């Protein structure tokens, strides 16, 4: 299969998975203005930011690399995909259930340690949510493996829709109708931020129930079209051992990787005193969310790219396809980065004005997402060569960098250092992964074009910030016009250099 055709397949799958991811993330993004405008204090949003940072870390621990392991072994010769699927399901269910039970039993000491001694129910609710999400990662991976993008997208969007509706119900509708007997009997307006977690667990439970048909499918015998000549069992200790040997290094990688993403929101409260800790975290967390468009794009690309890489890694022209994917990922990432920065004066209205003081972190976070996405693209050299320990090494280096920057500089410059820690961390491990990876798997990246687009992006940003710094008589709308012209220039250069040739490919 030619590289051009592979790029079209990747683009199609990215569009399908990306639509659900982008729409879902965007709709969830709309909860940010709801929280910042409706929750009574900035510290309330700080609680949301802090606890969801913890849940993100715990979710990676509870999946312990099995999602990627499933893709690797489901595509492996001599193994029945259904056996791999069943083994993954049973294993994840067992560990997730155990985690939820233990957290419920020890909710009080956990709540004390995290600084929420009067809200042990927050711990129990989120533990159950994390357990269900960890288990659901395998059925969702199975849907991606079997190329069933529509059910995947529908179930992802179902959760988002339910979560938004329930948040609106608890935070907006109920306060206005709590005098009704049917509402007043159970609704407590002072519970406030707690209803964010109640909405989450209800939406997650419904989504998990809807996954049941695909979970049951894993325990059905395959027909002749599904590798029926291979031995199929519901569970295999041998396969589990192989998967764990492959996936456990990915656990270290994943834990360190998610720590690089969430340590800022986990550690930040420890650098401030009293109530100011959650207030500063609330401001930081809200402004961090403004940059989520870049994360949406990276996530959409990941959904399509991971199964694409493992399925195509034996093709002779696969390395050419990987190089093209990297190039166009970077081009479109720069496009999003420029658009977000040039229109930040408009985007800032998605959060309440009391949070605007933190908008200076947005460009830094955008660059961090760009470096993170490039690092993700580079990471397949050690996944395809079964040298996943390198991913763990890079991630551990990243954690050390992240912690060092935050400990040294947050007390001096505040949450700006938290944002910088992510950008610097991903830039360093991105460079390390490229330098070491080319010794193990040769991929002909178009470094010349990537370098040119990087210089163009930096130059356009330099012009924009130079004008903003030197001209004091223009208002924000004039600068948005300037940004529009600069953005259009990038599009024109992209079209003339690459896009018109890409569109002509057959």
Q: Predicted regions span which residues?
A:
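Hydrophobic alpha-helical transmembrane segments
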Residues: 124, 154-221, 396-402, 415-436, ...
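Membrane-proximal transmembrane or re-entrant/amphipathic helices at the cytosolic face
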Residues: 2, 465-506
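Transmembrane-helix boundary and interhelical linker motifs in polytopic inner-membrane proteins
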Residues: 3-8, 36-44, 58-92, 111, ...
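Transmembrane helical elements of multi-pass membrane transporters/channels
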Residues: 13-28, 196-211, 215, 235-307, ...
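Alpha-helical transmembrane segments of multi-pass membrane proteins
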Residues: 57-58, 93, 97, 101, ...
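Interhelical loop/hinge segments that connect adjacent transmembrane helices in multipass membrane
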Residues: 1-10, 180-193, 197, 209-261, ...
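Signature of the first transmembrane helix
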Residues: 5-67, 95-106, 127-129, 163-164, ...
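Specific pore-lining/lateral-gate transmembrane helices of multi-pass inner-membrane transport
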Residues: 75-91, 283-395
């Amino acid at each position: 299969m030619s590289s051009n055709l592979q790029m079209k397949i990747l683009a199609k799958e990215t569009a399908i998975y990306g639509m659900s991811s982008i729409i879902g993330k965007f709709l969830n993004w709309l909860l940010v203005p709801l929280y910042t405008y409706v929750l009574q204090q900035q510290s309330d949003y700080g609680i949301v930011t802090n606890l969801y940072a913890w849940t993100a870390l715990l979710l990676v621990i509870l999946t312990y690399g099995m999602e990627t392991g499933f893709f690797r072994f489901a595509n492996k010769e001599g193994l029945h995909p259904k056996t791999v699927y069943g083994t993954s399901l049973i294993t994840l269910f067992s560990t997730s259930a155990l985690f939820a039970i233990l957290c419920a039993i020890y909710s009080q000491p956990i709540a004390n340690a995290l600084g929420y001694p009067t809200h042990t129910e927050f711990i129990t609710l989120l533990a159950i949510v994390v357990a269900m999400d960890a288990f659901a990662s395998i059925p969702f991976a199975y849907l991606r493996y079997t190329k069933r993008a529509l059910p995947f997208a529908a179930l992802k969007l179902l959760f988002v829709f339910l979560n938004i509706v329930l948040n609106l119900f608890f935070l907006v509708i109920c306060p206005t109708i709590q005098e009704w007997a049917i509402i007043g009997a159970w609704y407590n307006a002072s519970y406030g931020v707690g209803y964010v977690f109640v909405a989450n667990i209800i939406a997650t439970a419904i989504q998990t129930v809807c996954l049941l048909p695909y979970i049951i499918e894993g325990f059905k015998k395959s027909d002749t079209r599904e590798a029926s000549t291979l031995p199929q069992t519901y569970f295999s200790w041998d396969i589990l051992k192989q998967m764990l040997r492959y996936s456990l290094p990915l656990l270290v990688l994943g834990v360190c990787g998610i720590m690089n993403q969430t340590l800022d929101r986990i550690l930040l409260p420890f650098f401030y005193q009293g109530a100011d800790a959650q207030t500063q975290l609330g401001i930081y967390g809200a402004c961090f969310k403004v940059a989520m468009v870049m994360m949406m794009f990276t996530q959409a690309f990941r959904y399509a790219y991971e199964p694409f890489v493992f399925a195509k890694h034996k093709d002779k022209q696969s390395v050419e396809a990987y190089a093209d994917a990297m190039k166009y990922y970077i081009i479109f990432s720069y496009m999003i980065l420029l658009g977000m920065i040039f229109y930040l004066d408009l985007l800032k209205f998605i959060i309440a004005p009391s949070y605007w003081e933190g908008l200076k972190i947005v460009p830094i976070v955008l660059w961090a997402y760009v470096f993170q996405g490039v690092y993700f693209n580079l990471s397949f050299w050690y996944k395809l060569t079964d040298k996943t320990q390198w991913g763990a090494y890079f991630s551990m280096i990243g954690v050390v960098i992240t912690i060092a920057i935050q400990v040294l500089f947050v007390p001096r410059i505040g949450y700006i250092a938290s944002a910088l820690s992510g950008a610097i961390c991903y830039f360093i491990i991105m460079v390390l992964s490229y330098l070491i990876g080319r010794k193990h798997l040769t991929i002909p990246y178009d470094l010349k074009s990537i370098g040119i687009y990087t210089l163009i992006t930096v130059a356009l940003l330099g012009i924009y910030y130079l004008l903003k710094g030197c001209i004091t008589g223009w208002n924000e709308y004039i600068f948005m016009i300037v940004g529009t012209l600069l953005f259009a220039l990038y599009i024109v250069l992209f079209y003339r250099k690459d896009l018109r040739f890409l569109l002509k490919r057959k």
